[in-house]
């Protein structure tokens, strides 16, 4: 059974597939280079790579640099190159901006900056962490402990004995200063002893005190504790050499202070007041009740206030500020905090057209000690990455996520240890039975998604807000992750890469509303060999629904800018791997992979802004700034796009005597350079006369110049298809002899279609745009037309290849196709 059949290809929107031809969609091809899949325009040429500026005219940059973008706001967009020992910054017009390295230059030392340097932007700061550096604690410590004691007299009681006994290791015996309070029977003489300040003064000075009334029945003496022998009655703790030779004594109202000489800590001090030390007590190093601190003290005194027995985490330190005021402070001989030279540094936008790279003064520990206000867990470890989330700077180290204090991007320590505040720093580990090192993060579904090599974690909270007591890191999925490529977010999706044999897989990660779980679909499942293994960057442009993957070639031996006289060459480094997608009311109706090739160029990195992609590119023997407009707009003057790489607009000078126009190429001599009249759109051959100077015949003062590039679409093998529950299914039984294929095109210039039968010569069909008798066929302007080109094939469906090619500067829009052939099948399908 047989007959003539025809089948429509409604569009070419879904790029390429590396599946077998029978598994491909009807609107997928086998190869697509330098073409764009657009929902409105169909299959068209990719946008040109516009030349903006030469970033460095004398140096090329190795692929080991760390490319970074700074996007402060619409008016502050910058490209940055970090390399071994230095950093350079350019605006998006290609102007290099001055960078002062004020301090910390050694932090930029790296044999592989692309791998070692991890960055995050926060306002005018770009924080940079060097993965090769181990973070250390500051060796500078707080003030050393003062070996001191206080005697605090708080109440007075008649008839009681107030006694203080001190013993220093260098003393031969303990010395006791005792005051026998008067009975209170003679108020005229006894009332002076009611003041606690007077009691302290008498213990300090003996009967020489102005407050000792000898007419009372009070008694004072300074005695040896071992024998009870009286040493003095006129001298006390602060005036007798028996004590002052070993202690530096001072007094305040109601308070006596003693400091052990030479810092010797092996001394004792005992008090007795006849009332169980409720009227007078000593304080040495610590106290359990904050309210018992003396009202007066020295401003260099620090006392630990202890919490519950056995709970060292409830201890805190206070320092005397002024009368009656003790303020929480850091303990004695405690590391002040972090070693700034090993911590992340910053590139700072000075908002005057200049930048400064410098070491950061990270906030010191101001309270507690190494237990109650411990170092963040990244100390003595290497930093894996940086992030910013909910007004906190974050650090990933080992399996921990560490956040600064809320809105305080330089502080990793609590400001009080007496309570846990919601704004305090956060330090949590990823949950799970295995230790999973955290490498990266991305904002996702109103939360933060973190990546280890084998799992994903979501930052959550057991309360309404994320705080030190409520934050949790729960595993939400278990996909392998390539930590060489930073994940990106796009709307409600996140994209991340995986290593797959010698290639790269990319997953589209999403929250499944039906199952309330997270999942990740492999969007490269049909193009498993497309993206090479050395992928290093994903670029997301949500304005134009485009994802771009960049890959490098073998790592350069250079780690800083260098001079070369040899033009750069590349294998993968000049290629952009393009994923075009489109959602219609929540349903994905387009998923198209292709590649854009920038010949003889090495792309170092890119950034997305609005509908544009900006690339830092080594081309020739220097480094350039390239701009791609993903909208692929038509030129408003000539009515169509001009498709040239390194495209730029130049002004020519016309000489009527020679009938030549002269112009200067901003990027020097280029093989294959052509000129396009920006008024009529015609192309002209140019002649290089000297240096960067070119000429062309005629008067053409407004010009586009650039290098033509070739666009190629290889059509998939065609099959007769029938509808099933899975869509159109290819029928492989029978013989399908294709007679011709008709392509419908819109507003296109020159292109050609090549048919190459197996074992036979290639035949060509040309669309030159000229259709006799139509309004679009005019002399002196490029031929642009719409219509249908019918290509004869006369081959079995599996015995030929069909390529659509164009190297013209003119546009090409292929809308759809119609395949006509003869199909014969000996059997009938049931």
Residue ranges of each PLM-predicted region?
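Long, charge-dense tracts
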Residues: 125, 131, 145-154, 180-377
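Beta-sheet repeat architectures centered on beta-propellers
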Residues: 7-76, 502-830
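Beta-propeller and closely related beta-pinwheel folds
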Residues: 53-59, 361-391, 396-546, 550-608, ...
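Elongated alpha-helical scaffolds
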Residues: 114-135, 448-451, 458
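A short, polar beta-strand/turn micro-motif
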Residues: 137-150, 463-482, 709-727
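N-terminal beta-propeller domains
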Residues: 1-96, 285-385, 389-437, 498-518, ...
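Short linear interaction motifs
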Residues: 61-63, 101-117, 362-384, 430-439, ...
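WD40 beta-propeller blade core
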Residues: 88, 457-458, 626
């Amino acid at each position: 059974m047989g007959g003539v059949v025809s089948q429509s290809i409604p569009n070419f929107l879904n790029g390429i597939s590396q599946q077998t031809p029978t598994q491909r969609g009807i609107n997928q091809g086998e190869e697509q280079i330098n073409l764009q899949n657009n929902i409105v325009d169909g299959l068209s040429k990719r946008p040109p790579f516009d030349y903006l500026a030469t970033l460095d005219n004398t140096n090329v940059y190795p692929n080991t640099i760390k490319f970074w973008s700074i996007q402060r706001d619409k008016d502050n967009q910058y490209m940055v190159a970090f390399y071994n020992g230095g950093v350079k910054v350019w605006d998006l017009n290609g102007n290099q901006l001055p960078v002062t390295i004020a301090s910390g230059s050694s932090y930029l030392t790296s044999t592989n900056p692309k791998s070692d340097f991890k960055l995050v932007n926060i306002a005018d700061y770009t924080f940079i962490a060097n993965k090769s550096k181990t973070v250390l604690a500051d060796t500078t410590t707080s003030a050393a402990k003062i070996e001191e004691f206080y005697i605090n007299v708080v109440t007075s009681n008649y008839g009681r004995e107030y006694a203080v006994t001190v013993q220093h290791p260098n003393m031969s015996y303990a010395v006791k200063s005792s005051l026998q309070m008067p009975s209170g029977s003679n108020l005229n003489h006894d009332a002076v002893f009611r003041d606690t300040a007077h009691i302290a003064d008498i213990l300090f000075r003996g009967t020489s005190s102005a407050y000792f009334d000898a007419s009372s029945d009070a008694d004072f003496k300074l005695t040896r504790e071992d024998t009870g022998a009286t040493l003095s009655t006129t001298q006390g703790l602060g005036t007798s050499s028996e004590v002052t030779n070993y202690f530096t004594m001072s007094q305040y109202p109601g308070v006596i202070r003693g400091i052990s000489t030479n810092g010797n800590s092996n001394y004792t001090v005992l008090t007795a007041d006849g009332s169980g030390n409720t009227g007078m007590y000593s304080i040495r190093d610590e106290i359990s009740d904050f309210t018992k601190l003396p009202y007066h003290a020295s401003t260099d005194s620090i006392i630990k206030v202890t919490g519950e027995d056995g709970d060292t985490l409830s201890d805190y330190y206070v320092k005397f500020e002024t009368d009656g005021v003790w303020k929480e402070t850091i303990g004695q001989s405690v590391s002040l905090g972090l070693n700034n030279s090993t911590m992340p540094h910053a590139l700072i936008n000075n908002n005057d057209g200049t930048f400064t790279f410098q070491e950061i003064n990270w906030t010191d520990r101001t309270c507690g000690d190494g237990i109650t206000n411990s170092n963040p867990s990244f100390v003595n470890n290497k930093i894996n990455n940086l992030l910013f989330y909910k007004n906190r700077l974050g650090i990933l180290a080992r399996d921990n996520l560490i956040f600064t204090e809320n809105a305080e991007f330089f502080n990793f320590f609590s400001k009080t240890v007496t309570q846990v505040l919601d704004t305090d720093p956060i330090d949590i580990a990823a949950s799970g039975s295995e230790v999973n090192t955290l490498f990266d993060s991305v904002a996702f579904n109103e939360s933060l998604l973190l990546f280890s090599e084998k799992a994903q974690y979501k930052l959550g909270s057991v309360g309404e807000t994320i705080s030190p007591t409520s934050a949790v890191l729960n595993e939400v999925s278990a996909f392998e992750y390539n930590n060489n490529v930073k994940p990106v977010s796009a709307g409600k999706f996140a994209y991340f890469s995986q290593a797959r044999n010698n290639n790269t897989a990319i997953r589209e990660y999403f929250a499944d509303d039906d199952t309330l779980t997270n999942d990740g679909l492999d969007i490269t499942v049909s193009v498993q060999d497309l993206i090479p293994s050395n992928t290093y960057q994903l670029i997301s442009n949500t304005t134009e629904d485009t994802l771009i993957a960049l890959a490098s070639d073998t790592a350069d031996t250079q780690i800083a800018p260098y001079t070369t006289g040899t033009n750069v060459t590349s294998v993968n480094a000049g290629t952009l791997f393009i994923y075009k997608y489109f959602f219609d009311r929540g349903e994905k109706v387009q998923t198209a992979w292709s590649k854009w090739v920038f010949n003889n160029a090495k792309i170092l990195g890119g950034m997305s802004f609005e509908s544009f992609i900006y690339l830092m590119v080594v081309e020739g023997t220097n480094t350039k700034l390239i701009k791609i407009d993903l909208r692929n707009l038509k030129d408003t003057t000539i009515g169509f796009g001009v498709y040239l790489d390194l495209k730029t607009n130049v002004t020519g000078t016309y000489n009527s005597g020679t009938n030549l126009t002269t112009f200067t190429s901003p990027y020097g001599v280029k093989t294959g350079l052509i000129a396009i009249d920006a008024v009529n759109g015609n192309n002209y051959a140019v002649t290089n006369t000297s240096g960067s100077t070119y000429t062309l015949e005629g008067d053409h003062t407004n010009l586009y110049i650039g290098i033509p590039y070739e666009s190629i679409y290889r059509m998939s093998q065609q099959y007769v298809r029938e509808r099933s529950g899975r869509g159109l299914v290819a029928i492989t039984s029978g013989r399908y002899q294709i007679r011709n294929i008709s392509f419908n095109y819109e507003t296109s210039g020159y292109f050609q279609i090549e048919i190459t039968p197996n074992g036979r010569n290639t035949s060509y069909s040309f669309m030159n745009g000229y259709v006799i008798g139509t309004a679009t066929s005019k002399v002196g302007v490029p031929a642009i037309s719409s219509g249908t080109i019918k290509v004869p094939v006369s081959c079995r469906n599996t015995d030929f290849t069909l390529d659509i090619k164009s190297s013209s500067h003119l546009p090409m829009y292929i809308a759809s196709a119609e395949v006509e052939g003869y199909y014969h099948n000996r059997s009938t399908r049931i």
